[in-house]
């Protein structure tokens, strides 16, 4: 059975913003490794649209950006949306009955499936479907934005922590 994992970069004051917390090289290398190891990703519409950036090679990309793009393209993707009519390569729409679709996905796969997007993670948390939370804590204060937890914080238990590079700490939690 697959494990659903929600991980995002977070500021010290609890907000997620990919433009303000872009990963530094050590973290980016870790994210490439994770993307290669994952058996898929589940996206909300907005996050999927942002991630479509990786669909087409850019001439200015370095080797690590090309490696991440290749890992991302190879992953099966499930996009939760009622407004999208189509999705890109290696992606499928999830339009109805989120709980049933994710339970089936977890039952059919083995390995780790990433959850992308705080609103989607909130919905999946409320359904009791997320198995692990990874907070990549950055030493910045944003003061506003989208919170990592887009609703009440679930009861969690810290299971590990590690430092990535000089300034990022990964906190790994499971439901308590």
Task: List each model region and its residues.
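Enzymes that bind and transform nitrogen-containing heteroaromatic metabolites
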Residues: 1-176
